[in-house]
């Protein structure tokens, strides 16, 4: 099995290109602010005590007409 000179040169060029691309890639990490769970979102980092967490969707029980609830 003989490889042609063209195939060898293409393989060599591909290895060089891949090594350049891999060396210039920088990995991005998740910082600590994204992992803070003890502070509410949208509060200043220096004074989280000044913020009060509001429920996103307060509970409201539903009522169907067959249950004869008030207001229906």
Curated annotation (Swiss-Prot):
Signal peptide start-end: 1-27
Keyword Cytoplasm carried by entry: no
Keywords in alphabetical order: Disulfide bond, Hormone, Secreted, Signal
Localization: Secreted
Source superkingdom: Eukaryota
Disulphide-bonded residues: 43-51, 63-69
Gene Ontology CC annotation, any one: apoplast
Pfam families: RALF (PF05498)
InterPro entries referenced in this protein's UniProt entry, alphabetically: RALF
One MF annotation (Gene Ontology) recorded for this entry: hormone activity
Primary localization class, coarse: secreted
One GO process term, biological-process aspect: cell-cell signaling
Protein family: Belongs to the plant rapid alkalinization factor (RALF) family.
Protein purpose: Cell signaling peptide that may regulate plant stress, growth, and development. Mediates a rapid alkalinization of extracellular space by mediating a transient increase in the cytoplasmic Ca(2+) concentration leading to a calcium-dependent signaling events through a cell surface receptor and a concomitant activation of some intracellular mitogen-activated protein kinases.
Protein name (Swiss-Prot/TrEMBL): Protein RALF-like 20
Source organism phylogeny: Eukaryota, Viridiplantae, Streptophyta, Embryophyta, Tracheophyta
Gene (UniProt): RALFL20
């Amino acid at each position: 099995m003989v490889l042609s000179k063209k195939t060898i040169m293409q393989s060599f060029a591909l290895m060089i290109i891949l090594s350049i691309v891999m060396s210039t890639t920088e990995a991005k990490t998740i910082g600590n602010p994204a992992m803070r769970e003890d502070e509410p979102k949208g509060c200043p980092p220096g004074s989280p005590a000044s913020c009060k967490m509001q429920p996103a969707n307060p509970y409201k029980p539903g009522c169907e007409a067959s249950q004869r609830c008030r207001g229906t």
